[in-house]
């Protein structure tokens, strides 16, 4: 009988290692929650906690004091519920598809109602059950994505019976430009939100996303729901596409700590002659004798094809440029600057870490950190750690 493939063996076989620092996640939550108190701070853990594993990440936020958790779909909420304690509340940002209302109510999950149709369906279930059902009510204040329009809101206020069947916990909206402090759209959305709330006296409200928590107290209201900032991205810094050196030396303004070192394993090192072509299409041509290394990750692992002949990895302080096209399962690096024998089969190189942050990789991909983070995939060995005072202990 063959022995089972152990977790240690799986990790060794993986093309790279994604390390998730739970202590940094807790720090980021606490830093935001402390700064905006007494406003309650929720955690957005949709898309499997931005790709980092909601079943591990959400409990870390809970330990830091979080009791309100937002996901996008009902299925995400149902899957996460067993990993949280009974006093935690789960909210579904996209609301409910027809026919799922009873399951949502049965599970004790709160939907965000984004349209009159969703309101009517939720109220109809409340009538059948003979009790008011809790929910959040979202208004569109300028993003034109989700939420009741001004006309729908007028119609809703005219239907007293409909409103009486729902226990509205929060009126919410979403900032379209919260990560741009100087954008006038923020003030316009705030004004619209304030006007809406004047027609719903004493109703708690939520407007601030990650960027909104840095715009000032007038945006905080009763509940904030940061997302990307919890995962180590300064919302103001993520759009900085300035010179790389200036970008790397820029200090985060908001005590947000990076949470995910990412490394990849070398699978081959070789010497090539002048004129050798590298990768699909031969888009890189060696301009002299050089040493190259191939690492075992590619665009299937969230390292997008747009990094071809553009991005880099690091070994120690040495930058190793990506040469040739990024393949599905591999990337080739120019390692000529390293002494011969430095890299060998199984050596690890840094893709995200102290030498280049997630924002830097996103910039090289011409995208945003959200897209990289949620695309990292499940082929990495995932290691959850707590880092305290320079010491690291791996969790089970």
Swiss-Prot record:
Molecular function GO terms recorded: alanine racemase activity; pyridoxal phosphate binding
GO cellular component terms given for this protein: cytosol
Pathway the protein takes part in: Amino-acid biosynthesis; D-alanine biosynthesis; D-alanine from L-alanine: step 1/1
InterPro entries linked to this entry: Ala_racemase (IPR000821), Ala_racemase/Decarboxylase_C (IPR009006), Ala_racemase_C (IPR011079), Ala_racemase_N (IPR001608), Ala_racemase_pyridoxalP-BS (IPR020622), PLP-binding_barrel (IPR029066)
Active site: 46 (proton acceptor), 280 (proton acceptor)
Keywords: Isomerase, Pyridoxal phosphate
Catalyzed reaction equations: L-alanine = D-alanine
Residues reported to bind substrate: 145, 328
Modified residues (N6-(pyridoxal phosphate)lysine): 46
An individual GO BP term: D-alanine biosynthetic process
Enzyme Commission code(s) on record: 5.1.1.1
PROSITE patterns: ALANINE_RACEMASE (PS00395)
Cofactor(s) needed: pyridoxal 5'-phosphate
Role according to the record: Catalyzes the interconversion of L-alanine and D-alanine. May also act on other amino acids.
Family: Belongs to the alanine racemase family.
Protein name: Alanine racemase
Lineage: Bacteria, Pseudomonadati, Pseudomonadota, Alphaproteobacteria, Hyphomicrobiales
